Amino acid sequence: MKKIIPILLVLFLFITTSIVAQNSSVKGFIVSENNNFLSSVNITLSSTNHGIISNEKGEFEFKNLKKGKYVINLSMVGFEKKSITVRLKNNESKNLGRILLKEAIDELDEITINGVKNRYAKKKVSNSLRLQTPIKQLPQNIQVVGSEVLQDQLVTNMLEGAFRNVSGVSNIEHWGNFARVNMRGFRLPAFRNGVNIQDSWGPLSEDTFMIDRIEFVKGPSGFMMAAGEPGGFYNVVTKKPTEEKTGSINLMAGSFDTYRAAADFGGSLTSDKRLLARLNVLYQNAGSHRRFEDSERIGVAPSLSYKISDKTDFLTEFSFQKLNTLLGAAYIFAPLDKGFGSLPKNFSMVDSNFPDTDIKEVSLLNQLTHRFNNNWSVEAKYVTMLYTQQGASAWLNSMQNNGDAIRSVSIWDAISESEYFQLYANGNFNTGAVTHKVMGGFDYTDKEYFADFYQGGAVDTPTNPFNIYNPTYGDRIFPVFDRSTPLKDRTPSYSYGTKINSIYAQDEIGFLENKIRLTLAGRYTQLTPKGDITTKKFTPRIGLSADITPQITAYGLYDQSFLANDAIDNTGNRFDPIEGTIYEAGLKTNWLNGKINASLSAYIINKNNITTSDPTDPTRQFSILLGEVESKGFEFDMQAHITSELDLLLNYANTDVKIAKSNISNAVGTRIAGHAKHITNGWLNYNFNQNSALKGFGISLGYQYLVDRTSWTIGANNKAELPDYFRMDGGVHWKNNKLRIALNINNILNKHLYSGTKNDKFLYWQSEPGINGRISLTYNLF
């Protein structure tokens, strides 16, 4: 007995000491980016067998922990994984507070109950579009092109057809350095990370080495802007830092001596996952199906994000793009009576010694996000961009019927400087059974563009012309450009600038458990062109969205846009601003647990107060009111995961853009240039399943079909003179966990494809390459 008592005493002391040593705890609650509580999140402690899930309020707690260092791992289907490092002392109760899980928009946008993913469908827009509501419930047609389809199609930049994946979008003429994209009959401004960076001849087309996704927003969009064309806009979202370690190297080679290398690295720089980084780099050297049209491209895009606290995040993102190319080399010219496409598709109007152009674009984004609580957050964003260009452009002075041409070269130096600031708040609250998602903020834009294209001259002479039917290259004398004066001080020169100040407020009101959503919003804008008067405009936005069934949502939209009108009549009076108004209705569907996503929309866009030159004014200084342009049509988009092996992307658009009202006789009914009445695109991707002998292999096939195309400008006969356009592309690929090898063939049928227009002196067009291919190898390091 005397021996047992000491043993029991030691055992008692050991047990009580152990209990005291294991009375620490850690807890928190988990929310989504919309500040909704996340239940059923899997939460584990590294190096232990502890595992729990969060409750309906997103809460979790680990109790009876020893002092020491722990790593808390959080995971949930459809969300990015997250790890949090904590250090606990004896008897410490640590509250981590609010923990944010970000949706994995790059990887798990649509997942079925069987874990099958719709690779081409996206549930949400990016945070840069400010909207908290899923795409299916938004009262507007918004389509998202993700990195998955860009990889399948081996697209390398915006000029190569990323727009084919969205209904009704087409690429109009360009100078080889920027994407001239039209939709619903109007030019689309280019946005990048939620900022309108459109310029007079820009921006430099984004390369896919830095692109995460491209969002096409159709029609006026007051939640982003009011000053602009009414067709909509496209928003390029660049790659951002992530907690998960990423690393990949891509090598590509293709027709016309195209060689390309890109790399993508990222992950956490600290053990507590507070400092994240990403680096994307690119080098490309490419030829063309036309002679003497080589180009070189370099890109660097580093970014950092830092978690200042549990409620505050900071993001900084830098990008540098450099392009060397020959501007104007894409154009082909011919006499009026010869017809479009009358010269071979590889024909070149330029010589090897034509002066080339260097373009540099530098941008810096700084973004601060603060979450006050579960329902309210604010975000401030500052972006600055500098675009410089030094070079020349090639054009045509004259064309004779026998093919004798006088070509010209003019200087094209340019500087574009721009600054942007955005401050926006998002919030959620209830008034009884009615929910409210509110958003409001301020936008500031300051852009200036300077250019010199007034120096130049002919490179051919009447006695020594360039004949398009018997071309002789070389032996030409080029004008010498005087760059001794800084560009901004040169005379004559071209300059343009604009300042925009605007405020916006929106309330999305949810009824019947948010099955019906009414959006009431408005934007007040002050737009001041450089050296001109300020245009002030209030534009309302009204949207209605209703869940007819869990699979079908119906919506309607009314919104407005405007453009400053600098035209004056012969009495010196200025015309009213050009106004755009949209009426849109549609259906959005989601079938088979996300396997099939489709949308159908119909719209009418009216663009008022359009002017044209006064025919009675020989000076061409004055204008008269042309009237109203009406764009109407319907559009269909579908992204489908038909089986576990088969993915399909399909779209169709019917677009009709005409003058609807006019004071000018015979103008009503005139077709507006820059669109095709019918556009349909398809892309099919088949991956052999894991049990197949061809495991890892896949094939792709796609088409683009444009019917009843207008030229870039409509002729006096009010007829489109371009033939229908049909192109077929395909590819084959193999992949495993580390490696992906792909071979794509474009224009399989070797069609002579082109688009163009004419003036009163000659035709001009741009051709696409015949059958061509590229092979890509991507190696994943992790």
What do these predicted ranges mean?
Residues 31-33, 41-46, 75-79, 89, ...:
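Short, acidic, small-residue-rich periplasmic hinge/interaction motif at the N-terminus
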Residues 171, 179-180, 196-218, 236-238:
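Short acidic/polar hinge/loop motifs at secondary-structure boundaries
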Residues 210-212, 223-300, 308-312, 362, ...:
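Outer-membrane beta-barrel translocator/receptor signature
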Residues 309, 416-418, 435-439, 443-447, ...:
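Structural signature of Gram-negative outer-membrane beta-barrels, strongest in the C-terminal barrel
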Residues 369-373, 377-383, 388-393, 579-641, ...:
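Membrane-embedded beta-barrel scaffold of Gram-negative outer-membrane proteins
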Residues 515, 625-713, 776-780:
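Gram-negative outer-membrane beta-barrel transporters
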